[in-house]
């Protein structure tokens, strides 16, 4: 038997709580800042580049992975700056990602990004992240 139900009788399943909301950013042609030249930072640079971002990387030392990414012109603009990041590097960026071993460096980077109005992610340090 086919019974007709009204909307109030057929309630949709409700979603449980989420720790994070999955969001996709339109980064085509927008600038992203990465602090760190490590292989982990290179992986983030590769993701940003694949999304069309113009990536500026700041690190006193760059891994081979990072140098190879920057040399691959098919990836788009990946600019390596062989120096530490500065607060003035952040304004106008669509996002900032940092690779820091210590919480002090992570906290300073996150605070500077937020002060510039830039969403920030610190690799493997969720306490300092606005997004993952």
Stretches with model-predicted labels:
Residues 55, 80, 119-120:
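Hydrophobic beta-strand scaffold residues
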Residues 1-26:
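Glycine/serine-rich phosphate-binding loop and adjoining beta1-alpha1 elements at the start
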Residues 31, 94-95:
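Structural motif
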Residues 95-101, 106-131:
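ADP-ribose/adenylate-binding Rossmann-like module
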Residues 43, 51-71:
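NAD(P)-binding Rossmann-fold cofactor-contacting core
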Residues 59, 80-84, 124:
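Short loop/edge segments at beta-strand edges and connector loops
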Residues 20-49, 59:
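Glycine-rich adenosine-cofactor-binding loop
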Residues 74-91:
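Glycine-rich, highly charged phosphate/nucleotide-binding loops
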């Amino acid at each position: 038997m086919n019974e007709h139900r009204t909307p109030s009788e057929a309630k949709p399943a409700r979603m449980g709580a989420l720790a994070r909301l999955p969001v996709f950013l339109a980064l085509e042609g927008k600038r992203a800042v990465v602090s760190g030249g490590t292989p982990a930072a290179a992986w983030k640079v590769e993701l940003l580049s694949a999304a069309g971002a113009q990536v500026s990387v700041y690190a006193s030392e760059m891994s081979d992975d990072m140098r190879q990414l920057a040399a691959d012109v098919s990836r788009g603009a990946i600019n390596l700056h062989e120096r530490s990041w500065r607060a003035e590097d952040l304004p106008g960026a669509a996002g900032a990602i940092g690779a820091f071993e210590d919480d002090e460096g992570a906290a300073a980077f996150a605070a500077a990004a937020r002060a510039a109005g830039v969403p920030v992610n610190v690799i493997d340090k969720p306490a300092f992240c606005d997004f993952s």
